[in-house]
A protein has these predicted regions:
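Outer-membrane beta-barrel proteins
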Residues: 48-50, 73-77, 89, 111-113, ...
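Residues on the lipid-exposed face of transmembrane beta-strands in outer-membrane beta-barrel proteins
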Residues: 62-66, 85-91, 123-129, 148-152, ...
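Short glycine/proline- and aromatic-enriched beta-strand/turn motifs that initiate or cap beta-hairpins
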Residues: 24-90, 160
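N-terminal/domain-start segments enriched in small and hydrophobic, helix-friendly residues
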Residues: 33-38, 45-47, 135-146, 150, ...
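Predominantly the C-terminal beta-signal and adjacent terminal strand-loop region
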Residues: 75, 99, 109-118, 176-223
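Bacterial Sec-dependent N-terminal signal peptides
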Residues: 1-29
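Gram-negative (and chloroplast) outer-membrane scaffold detector with strong preference
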Residues: 95-165, 177-179
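Residues that define the transmembrane beta-barrel architecture of outer-membrane proteins
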Residues: 56, 77-85, 115-121, 142, ...
Length: 223
């Protein structure tokens, strides 16, 4: 009887050992993340105006500020300081997406104290990042708006006319004083064809940075 018990205990012991070993080997595999076991959540849909008509979320703004142009004398020289001002008109197609067009004028910093004057036309796409992340809120006091667009400039320097164009990016910080009025600060950086400062360089392009401050007025409409 004692021999039979010993014979039975040995297989049972081996079964238990193999079971524990197999479970230990499978455990890490079960704990590993498997992306196929999960479904991604759909991104939130962009909000829309209930009854959108062209121009029913119109806004106008006036702005002025400083510009920094790359020095024509040297790549590493201190950028020259210029001025610009403008008027813009825009419309919001939804609480997130909008567009504006602008008429601009100012002067670039040129060599030897000869500053090229310019007038220009611009068009920008606007994305209300705050509304995209936190939904639309008509009484919100602070908004962050991304800007991407292009600009054409007609330049005049010492009796000579020329033109230039380029693309620019900006980030507007908007403070809403009331449902009708707002103030904003907007830093921008742009890459332009060579010659906005009246001088051609070996790099064949110019860059311009600016900091604009503006006041705006928006039209009220139904949401």
């Amino acid at each position: 009887m004692r021999g039979f018990t010993s014979v039975v205990r040995l297989p049972l012991f081996l079964i238990v050992v193999f079971t524990i070993s197999a479970a230990a080997q499978e455990q890490p595999e079960n704990n590993q993340f498997n992306g196929l076991d999960y479904t991604l959540q759909k991104p939130a849909k962009n909000e829309r105006y209930a009854k959108k008509k062209f121009g029913d979320h119109l806004f106008i703004s006036g702005e002025a500020g400083l510009i920094l142009d790359r020095s024509a004398g040297s790549l590493f020289a201190t950028p020259g300081l210029g001025l610009r001002a403008g008027l813009t008109v825009g419309d919001w197609f939804s609480p997130v997406h909008g567009m504006r067009v602008g008429l601009n004028a100012g002067l670039h910093n040129g060599l030897a104290g000869v500053n090229p004057y310019f007038v220009g036309l611009s068009a920008d796409y606007l994305m209300n990042i705050t509304s995209l992340l936190h939904k639309d809120n008509p009484v919100r006091m602070f908004e962050l708006i991304g800007v991407a667009g292009g600009e054409y400039q007609l330049l005049y320097r010492t009796g000579n006319w020329s033109h230039a164009g380029g693309f620019r990016l900006g980030m507007q910080t908007r403070f809403n004083f009331s449902p009708l009025t707002f103030f904003y600060l907007e830093p921008r950086i742009g890459i332009y064809s060579d010659g906005i400062d009246g001088i051609k360089t070996w790099m064949r392009y110019d860059w311009e940075a600016s900091l604009m401050a503006g006041l705006g007025y928006r039209l009220l409409s139904d949401p």
